[in-house]
């Protein structure tokens, strides 16, 4: 069987991350929210905190792996998208916010450990 396309692998990684986060009590507010500045993979609510979750998948650990792929430029794009989300959804604008990263590495996700880095960066 041929390897899954990168978009299929990324979708599977997001599905796995969403399932894990829901199991930890987070509630989904939006998925793949798009704007001119970029995309937010998952927007979730953890108690009263709005959580912007970037899901990163890498097949191999080269070049820093999944976690290493969140550079300063990516952080700025996520921050911009989060601000636009809050402007478009004012009911969440007065809530505390944080940026989390869920990283998955390797082939296949079922049963694979994931890394959930809460408060991965400050904005």
UniProtKB/Swiss-Prot annotation:
Q: Which organism is it from?
A: Pseudomonas entomophila (strain L48)
Query: Family assignment?
Result: Belongs to the UPF0102 family.
Q: Which HAMAP family match?
A: UPF0102
User: Which pairs of Cys residues are joined through disulfide bonds in the record?
Assistant: none
Q: What is this protein called?
A: UPF0102 protein PSEEN4497
Q: Which CDD domains match?
A: PoNe_Nuclease
What are the recorded GO MF terms, alphabetically?
nucleic acid binding
């Amino acid at each position: 069987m041929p390897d899954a396309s990168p978009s299929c692998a990324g979708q599977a990684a997001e599905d796995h991350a969403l399932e894990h986060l829901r199991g930890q009590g987070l509630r989904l507010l939006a998925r793949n929210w798009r704007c001119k500045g970029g995309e937010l993979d998952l927007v979730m609510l953890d108690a009263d905190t709005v959580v912007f979750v970037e899901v990163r998948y890498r097949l191999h650990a080269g070049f820093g792996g999944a976690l290493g792929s969140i550079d300063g430029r990516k952080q700025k794009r996520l921050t911009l998208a989060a601000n636009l989300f809050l402007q478009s959804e004012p009911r969440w604008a007065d809530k505390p916010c944080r940026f989390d990263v869920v990283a998955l590495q390797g082939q296949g996700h079922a049963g694979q450990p994931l890394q959930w880095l809460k408060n991965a960066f400050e904005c």
